[in-house]
A protein has these predicted regions:
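Short intrinsically disordered, low-complexity coil segments enriched in acidic
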Residues: 1-7, 36, 41
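Cysteine-centered motifs
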Residues: 3, 7, 15, 21-24, ...
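Metal-cofactor-binding active-site regions of metalloenzymes
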Residues: 43-298
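Short, Lys/Arg-enriched N-terminal segments with co-localized hydrophobic residues
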Residues: 22, 30-41
């Protein structure tokens, strides 16, 4: 940096120690001769203290949180894949098979839908994700993706368009190993409980099977997600209500019977361990109304 009045020589390092130029008295930043050399080294992006920027944070994480079990009360893992202990063929199936957060960023990056949910090959989809990821520095997805690459695949580099082939081959080689099935990945993460995301009409058959499986000691419980029962504006709403009527045994033809059907399904969920709900409400449409008005509207 140089002084605005060209009083100081150009230097290639800035530290927090401010000094004034002897000629123009402007506050400048110059090389600090008293700082230790190791303090001037650039911090690694993904070291053991990633995101831990204070001594207190490091102590709390490494001495306490790091080895504590995970209770995951909201996720999008398919309970069928846990039950059947799925073995993925490639990293695209793991990362892009149903992750709408990644899909959203790819769309924002101008990626054609063919490479997101379309008929492109898994390798092509991964390439487009890698090219998107390099533009997401500062986004949690950038952190999550690189943390996963390091922890589960041993990759400590950067995923981008140029390294996509290398990462693709490395991850797929690891996924071919027997210890990288869905259940084993969950166990490696020290997870003790998982709550999946389930619709009121879901049968929960895989939760029932997992509850009886003595070979897997991680609890897998359902979570109540009734969004489809509330989305009256959706064109598929009436078809959904027919399915709700079938599984509940209550013909939904009024607001009262809708509530009765949902309550019956809530009881069904509760009997299978459900104790949490999950709602994707962008906003709450509220207006005071009597029971008669609600029935007339519905």
């Amino acid at each position: 940096q140089i002084c605005r009045k060209d009083c100081l020589k150009s230097i290639d390092f800035i530290c927090i120690d401010g000094v004034k130029c002897n000629k123009c008295k402007r506050l400048q930043y110059r090389r600090c001769k008293h700082r230790k050399q190791e303090e001037r080294k650039m911090k690694k992006f993904m070291d053991e203290d990633f995101l831990l920027t204070s001594d207190a944070a490091k102590k709390l994480y490494h001495d306490y949180a790091e080895n504590m079990p995970i209770v995951d009360y909201h996720c999008h893992i398919n309970p069928q894949e846990i039950c059947e202990d799925r073995k993925f063929e490639n990293i695209t199936q793991v990362w892009l098979g149903g992750d709408h957060y990644k899909w959203r960023q790819m769309r924002s990056n101008g990626v054609d839908e063919k490479y997101i949910t379309g008929d492109a090959t898994d390798r092509e989809k991964f390439q487009k994700w890698a090219e998107t990821l390099e533009k997401l520095i500062g986004n949690p997805l950038y952190h999550w993706s690189h943390l996963e690459l390091k922890r589960y695949f041993g990759y400590e580099g950067y995923l981008n368009g140029e390294t996509a082939e290398e990462v693709w081959n490395l991850c797929n080689e690891k996924l071919a190993q027997d210890d990288m099935t869905v259940r084993n990945i969950i166990k490696k993460s020290n997870v003790k409980l998982i709550c999946t995301t389930d619709d009121p009409i879901d049968t929960l058959e895989y939760h029932e099977k997992l509850a009886k499986d003595d070979t897997f000691d991680v609890k897998v419980l359902p979570a109540w997600r009734p969004d489809k029962a509330m989305n009256l504006e959706k064109p598929e709403y009436l078809d959904y209500i027919k399915k709700l009527s079938e599984v509940s045994g209550i013909e939904v033809k009024s607001f009262k019977t809708l509530i009765e059907a949902l309550v019956k399904r809530m009881d069904y969920f509760q009997e299978r361990g459900c104790s949490v709900s999950d709602h994707a409400l962008e906003y709450v449409m509220y207006a005071p109304a009597s029971d008669e008005e609600i029935e007339a509207i519905y």
